[in-house]
């Protein structure tokens, strides 16, 4: 109990104040200056020069529009001679911050609603009607089973379904890609950015770009780094992939536009930087459900009014435009905050040197005596002197 009272009394009735002691030691002095120099180098070099700690920052607000250009032709036994332009291979016509270019397809023509044999599979091949369950519709079924086992070809029978007939057969994807010439199609990317905190706006079609230049330029990282027109093959190649390979089963490519702007400089120095990467992960060792595809249909009616459709399973490349960046401009508040933080960090040198001097050096007990001085209360000390 007495010990607790002593500790409590010491806490309540004692006061400590810093005492300046000048220690003439080469080791301690050199260490102190070294730590101070390191802190100054960090504050000046990293905080102010590299991280621009004297600036207020803002994130980019962006809008993007994409326009595709290019035309090609095909001549096949199924479709005959055909010209393909933007309205044929850009599906849908407009998307938010992205565009889909169809490069390959499986076409099932002249479908009508009726009864027909299902495509052969583990659950659809049959020998008798007993092998088929009427009314069943599996996840991968083309229609609803009727319960009948019918001839698929001369040697094979499958369960009959009520569906759009003939049903689609997508077991084999065309190789090479149906629209392999899409490698030379181009994308015009128009990007407008805005930093609301600074009321600063700009677009990637720079002021020095003329109409004549825009009609002839194609983006190249070395010769035309600010041309907003990109060749599809070059985009895929820059991401480290082969266009003809990805065109077969499709994929997702990212066009990244980086806007990092120092608004303490002229607006002409605020420029877009382009980079490219494939966004859908492709694992060759586990190549399950690769690529990118979807289905759509074109409907029409014959002279008798019967509804028909052409079903297209479209494989292609979706180009996502990803815009990011930040802008900075001088502001007194972050400047003063970082200066104050830097000055506070200088105190670390004193604390570190105190620890070395008072607890690690051979003469630590001597330095402790010089560092700390115990003084009694003035009135109590005066009373003790009078008694003596």
From Swiss-Prot:
Gene3D superfamilies: atp-gated p2x4 ion channel, atp-gated p2x4 ion channel domain. Keywords: ATP-binding, Cell membrane, Disulfide bond, Glycoprotein, Ion channel, Ion transport, Ligand-gated ion channel, Lysosome, Membrane, Nucleotide-binding, Receptor, Transmembrane, Transmembrane helix, Transport. It holds the Pfam family P2X_receptor. It is found in: Cell membrane; Lysosome membrane. Disulfide bonds join 116-165, 126-149, 132-159, 217-227, 261-270. InterPro entries: P2X4_purnocptor, P2X_extracellular_dom_sf, P2X_purnocptor, P2X_RECEPTOR_CS. CTP binds at residues 67, 69, 186, 293, 295, 313. The keyword Membrane applies. GO terms for molecular function: ATP binding; ATP-gated ion channel activity; cadherin binding; extracellularly ATP-gated monoatomic cation channel activity; identical protein binding; ligand-gated calcium channel activity; purinergic nucleotide receptor activity. ATP-gated nonselective transmembrane cation channel permeable to potassium, sodium and calcium. CTP, but not GTP or UTP, functions as a weak affinity agonist for P2RX4. Activated by extracellularly released ATP, it plays multiple role in immunity and central nervous system physiology. Could also function as an ATP-gated cation channel of lysosomal membranes. Functional P2RXs are organized as homomeric and heteromeric trimers. Forms heterotrimer with P2RX1. Interacts with P2RX7 (via C-terminus); this interaction is functional only in the presence of ATP. Forms heterotrimer with P2RX4; functional differences between homomeric P2RX4 and P2RX4/6 heterotrimer are minor. Interacts with AP1M2. Belongs to the P2X receptor family. This is P2X purinoceptor 4. It comes from Bos taurus (Bovine). The lineage of its organism: Eukaryota, Metazoa, Chordata, Craniata, Vertebrata.
